[in-house]
Amino acid sequence: MNKTLVLLCFACFVITNTVFAQNEPVRIAFWNMENFFDPFVDSTKTYNAFTEDGMQHWTKTRFYRKRNNMYKAILAMSENRPLGILGMCEVENEYVLSSLFEQTPLKKHNYRWILYEGPDNRGIDPAIVYSLDHFQLVESMVFPYYNPEDTAYHSRDILYAKFIGADASSVAYADTLHVFVNHWPSRYSGELETVGSRSCSAAILRAKVDSIVVAAPEGYQPKVIMMGDLNDCPTDPSVYDVLRARHPSELEEGCFINLFGKNDGLGFEGTLKHQTDWQIFDQIIVTPAVMDDREGLHYKEGSARIFHADFMLEDDETYHGKKLFRTYIGPRYFGGFSDHLPVYIDLIGNEE
């Protein structure tokens, strides 16, 4: 075979594989990690239940088991490829992220992360993990929770990051991607008693996304992904009315698209279970531009899923069926994963 033919074959191989890589789905996921604490005492915080001498007797052995459980689930969810973006909540600090993404087989996927220490009284915050194989970080910041009717109450920040594609010159990655990670106020004090605080978080998120849309150049529709544990179902007022996030079958002018708005083809009953009822608190919501398949990265139709590997579940002997294999239930240690299942969608680029 002469040199010209060899070079031609090599060029064809490179072009073919580049196009294929650009059109492989990019998985975007979210997971509530449930109390992902390190085992060390933090003298700057008043909450130290998750330490060796604390109420939960959180030892190094238990921490490493939790970490290893999480990396196995993430590898399974990503099908052993790098996730494009993984939003997380209930993350204590940089140490647990470094341990998870630099000291396990996840290290091969070239992840980086974003975490800001926030006002949560337990010291747990949202985080964004992203693959340098897929995205470059442009900027990040947090938007604090603020309720003018109850200024004494503090809740978790909303984490924001702006990305461009790792290969910004390619058609598949030409667009900017805006990502918001949420962990709205819990129902711990009662659903009705706390509905206003979640509506407040929804209003903050809506205002921030609207500001991105308004500031965009004429004729350009920003691609925004909102994800998180909203502590409300898709039809609850905070999500449906305040954020105005609707299932694609219920869209109205000015609405965002809740890809988890109905349990229609999501692959599982819900993301968390209360007695006999599965609910979808963990959701991924997008602006209409993410659904536009004419240019750049866009939603792969039908890809929204609740990830539920068998090893993340166990038999529910009280309420029947399956339940989540958790790390703790109250003070009792079980050595499992989380009290939430992760969710994901796939984005795909245009063929050239």
Regions found by a protein language model. Name each.
Residues 35-42, 170-172, 188-189, 293-295:
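Short, solvent-exposed loop/turn elements at domain surfaces
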